[in-house]
Swiss-Prot record:
Pathway: Cofactor biosynthesis; adenosylcobalamin biosynthesis; cob(II)yrinate a,c-diamide from sirohydrochlorin (anaerobic route): step 6/10
Class of enzymatic activity (EC top level): transferase
Protein name, as recorded: Cobalt-precorrin-5B C(1)-methyltransferase
Taxonomy of the source species: Bacteria, Pseudomonadati, Pseudomonadota, Alphaproteobacteria, Rhodospirillales
Enzyme Commission no: 2.1.1.195
Top-level taxon of origin: Bacteria
Catalytic activity: Co-precorrin-5B + S-adenosyl-L-methionine = Co-precorrin-6A + S-adenosyl-L-homocysteine
Annotated family: Belongs to the CbiD family.
Length: 357
């Protein structure tokens, strides 16, 4: 089965923005003295029309609240199963629509995001969707508060704290649909990380492949955690965004195997989409002056770690060579962008074993 077929066989889900809008639509029905619709149908930006079952419903004088359980389908989304509630409260005529961050929804505290500092982290498309359902209900003057149960703790497992979104989650989505394993959320977070770094005047950021490389890079460079952009396997996504939105200095930090893939030209470092080229590593050892015995043993290796261990035992700077080659590939992607590139190769113990740029 190819990846396209595999993606089609997986169950899609709905974004936090779609869930919040569905909850709001139900609350608005109750606010105008109609029964809560259950399920509540919602038309998404691309025309899909899912129905959302209500998990909670409540009314009071001049207000109504409804809740929906977030269903991310087969995507490994940290918000899957979270209760998302919308509370609509009538305001005096002329007040307009006012969005509030309820419990578990974050507040923007740094520039560079598509929302102003101090605003609730309800992104532009979900806001537009909510505005549309309010208009359809004939309600122009409302306070709309979105809450996510346990959102503050869930947010600690996301990029929000580093992006300066504090107190909870973001209400996200551009299409309303979560495509399983599309990685769109990760790419979105990479881009927002670059935007925030630029807006706050950072001259040096570190793209890391994981927690080990992050710790090693920060210790080695003396930078704080807010310099980190957790690119995971998506080095290409980071580089392509930096090409158009440059930051003066980028350090790429990762494990030897992943960065050997980058040195070979791979821009998606996931094992399903790029494999370590063991023969290429053996050829590099030969170019560094390895004996034929070492080269032959490297050619028989099963993993990149085995080749690195051979190189270290022979006193050959293979990791440094990989760092320089990876930096060359990165610069080629960046083109004429004014970004200085350096690379740190980190072993599994968290030690920097190669550096180049």
């Amino acid at each position: 089965m190819d990846e396209a077929d595999e993606g089609r066989s997986l169950r899609r889900g709905w974004t936090t923005g779609a869930c919040a809008t569905a909850a709001l639509k139900a609350a608005l029905e109750a606010l105008v003295d109609r029964p809560f619709p259950d399920p509540v149908a919602l038309t998404l930006p691309r025309g899909e029309r899912p129905a959302f079952a209500l998990a909670t419903r409540e009314t009071g004088p001049g207000w109504a609240r409804a809740g929906v359980i977030k269903d991310a389908g087969d995507d490994p989304d940290v918000t899957h199963g979270a209760l998302i509630e919308a509370t609509a409260r009538l305001l005096p005529k002329g007040s307009g629509l006012i969005f509030r961050a309820g419990s578990g929804v974050g507040t923007v505290t740094k520039p560079g995001l598509p929302l102003a500092v101090g605003e609730p982290a309800i992104n532009p498309v979900p806001r537009a969707m909510m505005t549309e359902v309010a208009t359809a209900a004939g309600l122009a003057d409302l306070e709309i508060s979105i809450a996510v149960a346990q959102g503050a703790s869930i947010a600690l497992r996301t990029w929000n704290p580093r992006l300066g979104i504090l107190g909870g989650l973001s209400i996200l989505g551009t299409t309303g649909v979560v495509v399983p394993y599309s990685c769109s959320a990760w790419i979105h977070s990479i881009r927002r990380g670059v935007d925030v770094a630029r807006a706050t005047g950072r001259a040096h950021v570190v793209g890391t492949t994981g927690a080990t490389s992050e710790r090693a890079a920060l210790d080695h460079l003396g930078l704080d955690a807010e310099a980190v952009i957790d690119m995971g396997d998506f080095v290409g996504g980071l580089l392509k965004y930096l090409r158009d939105h440059p930051i003066p200095h980028l350090t790429i930090a990762g494990g030897f195997a992943k960065l050997s893939k980058l040195a070979d030209g791979a821009l998606d470092l996931h094992s399903k989409r790029a494999q370590v080229d063991i023969p290429a590593l053996a050829r590099r050892l030969a170019a560094l002056g390895a004996t034929q015995a070492v080269v032959s043993e490297a050619e028989r290796a099963n993993t990149a770690l085995e080749v690195l261990t051979l190189a270290q035992a022979a006193g050959l700077p293979l990791a440094t060579a990989i760092a320089f080659e990876a930096a060359t590939v990165a610069r080629a992607v960046l083109g004429e962008a004014p970004v200085r590139v350096s690379v740190l190769v980190v072993d599994r113990g968290g030690r920097v074993v190669g550096e180049g740029g």
